[in-house]
Amino acid sequence: MGRRNNPATWLLALVVLALALFAGPCAAGQIKTTDTRWSFHLPLPSGITGAESLAFDGKGEGPYAGVSDGRVLKWGGTTVGWTTFAHSANYRKIPLCTAGVVPSEETESMCGRPLGLQFHAKTGDLYIADAYLGLMRVGPGGGEAEVLATGADGVPFNFVNGLDVDQATGDVYFTDSSTTYPRRFNTEIMMNADATGRLLKYDARTKTVAVLKADLPYPNGVAVSRDGAQVVVAHTVPCQAFRYFLRGARAGQYELLADLPGYPDNVRRDDKGGYWVALNQEKQRLDATPATAPVKHLVGVRLNADGVEIEELTAAKGVTLSDVAEMKGKLWLGSVELEYVGLVA
């Protein structure tokens, strides 16, 4: 028979257990909540929607936004408003592109659909992930963008999506979300659990494209870490963020960084070494009822460098985000569906 325990010892053990069970989440740090319902709206030009991705140039000017008619627009302040910065070769040639109406999903491939955007600050070049036309680039003066690549390893791009630039090397990391389904069939990627996506690298020196990782489930947004040692990739399905190690003992490894509370779109570095992840939709609980439905609508989360959630963004029901870009302490909000760009000062 074992030693008889003192009642005081039992009481202490119960207190410790209670603290572990009920106070555990607090130990990880309080998650800050930012409500975006009071954000300032910058309306897009009439007939234009879907500022899917946002970028700022090396001077901090912008944002620049890829929109529904195939153009990249630049915000010049409240006096200037939005002006055309870049477009594909077809934009000036096809009347549909300049008709002033939102192209349908069936016809947007003719005009192009810019998604991921990022500048290389040293050269001033803007790199564009066009869903249909491929990886593109335009110089600091804007104008007609040139196509840099339309495929890799003999496989054509089918749905070019997220993009980021290593500012030290000029190399571009981007995703081809599916080699089976184009953008207008993006729901089929999820419904059929398609896992034919790829993470790719455009070498700025050799001007070649390499496949870093294949057979991925809906890879979307991309962000190079602040130290350039890894690339974070948001997977719309299965609502996760992974990281690919570029150098060191773990070079080439692909590992889970975070499980996410919704379906992610773009991922961006924040100003503290972490990441902002835009959520196009929250996860749906199969057992959800009106009584158990969440009282807040998540549209984005902030992760630290280790993948721990430290902040969440909320919005009114029905609002979805595709991008959260931080610039000089302000949050700029892009959406693939809305008719404006949001600003949280």
Regions inferred by a protein language model and the residue ranges of each:
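Sequence-structural signature of mature extracellular/luminal beta-sheet repeat domains
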Residues: 2-345
